[in-house]
Amino acid sequence: ESTAYRLAKHDRAKWPDIKTAGHEGDTPYYTNSSHLPVDYTEDIFSALDIQDDLQTLYTSGTVFHAFLGEKLPDWKAAASLVRKIAENYKLPYYTLSPTYSVCANDGYLAGEHFTCPICGKEAEVYSRITGYYRPVKNWNDGKRQEYKNRTVYDIIHSKSPEQKMKSYGAAEKLAEQAAGKEEPKAAAAA
């Protein structure tokens, strides 16, 4: 965790124009291992498609973090997501990583709340930093910048492998119809 920031900071000092993760003006950092940029996509299955091809080339030391923002609605949603990943990808390791907050007065709060929505006092936001959860305020500057840039996966609007295949099949049929290889159903019925 500290290396991703420390090396990027040293590289930026030595080579001011070097490309690091994040955006112009951000605190420099590198993503861990060969992860996608943290703001690459909201579609978890698009990210999995890319990472599956890459992470299966390694013999160890890889993990796909499914940063979810708030927790999933229930255990069935989590089980369904895990099943889809297990049945459609060869990734050796993956995590479901929701963000949560803790208020000294009101306890556990789902999602990111720097201020408690119940009592209005300061709350601690916890998220996964590599392999474990820690309060975001205790992270180094580079990891905090990574957290700020992080796009969480939108599970509801992500296109599962099954949905992608259906879309592909429908598009293929339309292309065949347009090429005159197959008559449209309405014309065939007439």
Task: Please describe what each predicted stretch is.
Residues 1-190:
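Long, C-terminal-biased catalytic regions of enzyme "large/alpha" subunits
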